[in-house]
Amino acid sequence: MVSWIISRAVVLVFGLLYPAYASYKAVKTKNVREYVRWMMYWIVFALFMTVETFTDIFIAWFPFYYEIKMAFVVWLLSPYTRGASLLYRKCIHPTLSLKEKEIDSYIIQAKERSYESFVNIGRKGLNIAASAAVQAATKGQGALVGRLRSFSMQDLRALPDDTPIHYRDALYPDAPELHRRPIGYPTTSHADSDSMDERWSDSEMAETRTAARTRGGMPSKPLQRSQSLRVSKKKGLSREVSTKTTKPKGKKKPAQSEPEN
């Protein structure tokens, strides 16, 4: 554990911070020799960090692993050994020169494929989002339809007739509630044009007519409107005639006989 902490501190200070400041000085002074030196160092150090990622996983158990790593970083950076310049000129530069075209083609293919994969992933994401929105809309529509079906006409007709239904205006909530009859409430009022005598005459004449037809063996037929009115008028006239005929006659006084002389 102590070796790991010390090695990380050495790598950060001598491998990153000091070379970064030296590169800044080279750029500021425009010293081409120092500029080339630190460019070679950064190329070698980038490869070192890539290899270190795997070696820390697989061979970190090796004895004196962290000590070897610290010594390697110091060897790369030391102005006496110039390990970074040596590795670059002997190994890295010849290898990159041979594989440069292949590396460039791989980079171009990676750019194209990454763009295509990004577009495909975006399309798939949009399709998934659209399908999810459609499913949510259909589920919401189904729930709304079920809610509306619960308020069907059959449910409204099943309400008791005695209980009044109050209607409140949404625009004026403070207004008094309106009392209205429920939908489908049976109306018991008759037409205003029919009087009580006409309704009585219709019912009475219909009963007498049906009784007469059943006695005579004829099927009963309902009276029409005009017939009922005529019957009522005739009945009124017959009543008047009967009252006139049944008026009691006054008794004649017997004539007094004159006394005989």
From Swiss-Prot:
Q: What is this protein called?
A: Receptor expression-enhancing protein 4
Keyword Ribosomal protein (UniProt): no
Q: Where is the protein situated, by its record's location annotation?
A: Endoplasmic reticulum membrane
Which Pfam families is this protein grouped with? Answer: TB2_DP1_HVA22
* InterPro entries listed in its UniProt record: TB2_DP1_HVA22 (IPR004345)
Q: Which GO terms describe its cellular component?
A: endoplasmic reticulum; endoplasmic reticulum membrane; microtubule
Report the protein's function: Microtubule-binding protein required to ensure proper cell division and nuclear envelope reassembly by sequestering the endoplasmic reticulum away from chromosomes during mitosis. Probably acts by clearing the endoplasmic reticulum membrane from metaphase chromosomes. May play a role in the maintenance of both the nervous system and the musculature.
* Lipid bilayer topology: Multi-pass membrane protein
